[in-house]
Amino acid sequence: MVSFDVDGTIFRKAALTQATRSLGIGEKWDALDQMYHHRRITLRECLASEYKLLHGMKLADIIREVSKVEVIKNVRETVEKLQGHQIRVILLTDNPDFLCAYLIERFGFEGYVGSKVGIKDGIVTGEIETLPDKRLGLRKYCAWTGIPLSRCAHVGDWVNDVPVFRIVRYSVALNAKTEKVKASASHHIETDDLLDVYHHFQSIN
């Protein structure tokens, strides 16, 4: 199984952060990000507070803005090539499930592990269950599917991918933001084409 991070990996920038600027909540969203980066709130608190800002919004409006955010080249092609080798391809992210559902529909991913944000009649509700610990999320998913971590690879770009890198068999830091992330992965790649990751997997197999 191969899992892909979302922001900075599939999307070139943080998708919801970009979308909120057109939705009128960009300043509040950015302020929460800053509080987290200055360690005044935890990641769990940051995610919960950010997702509360979406309460009452139309899902269609959010997805419309998200769809404008640039994605890395050849996502569907990479997913399909991996699936051609009977490899399950999923998303592993702290982003909401509705964002994962959009990417599954657009690119053909087979599943996701992410935060849960309620939607009723096309409107975002206040029901929120965040996933600040992607490692825990992947462990649960592996237990549910019966796929051992020793048969998993993860592709990501940020510090919250590092704990995942440490428990899977193989990891790729893709366009990683820091040396720590690069050093924590089995391999690191700088590219604007996701097929380069597929070709790397082929070369090590």
Q: Regions from the language model: what does each represent?
A:
Residues M1-R44, A48-S49:
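Active-site neighborhood of HAD-like aspartate-dependent phosphohydrolases
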Residues A101, E105-C152, V162:
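Substrate-recognition "cap/lid" segment bordering the active-site pocket of phosphatases
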Residues V89, T93-D94, S150-D192:
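Acidic, Mg2+-coordinating phosphoryl-transfer loop and its flanking beta/alpha structural elements
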Residues R44-E77:
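Metal-dependent phosphoesterase signature
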Residues K120-G126, V181-H188, Y198-S203:
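Short, charged, surface-exposed secondary-structure boundary motifs
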Residues V75-F107, G111-S115, F165:
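Substrate-recognition element of Asp-dependent hydrolases with the DxDx(T/V) motif
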Residues I63-R76, L92-D94, G114-S115, G126-P132, ...:
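Conserved beta-strand/loop elements of the cytosolic catalytic core of P-type E1-E2 ATPases, chiefly
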Residues S115-K120, A176-K180, D193-V197:
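Short, acidic/turn-prone active-site loops that include or flank metal/cofactor-
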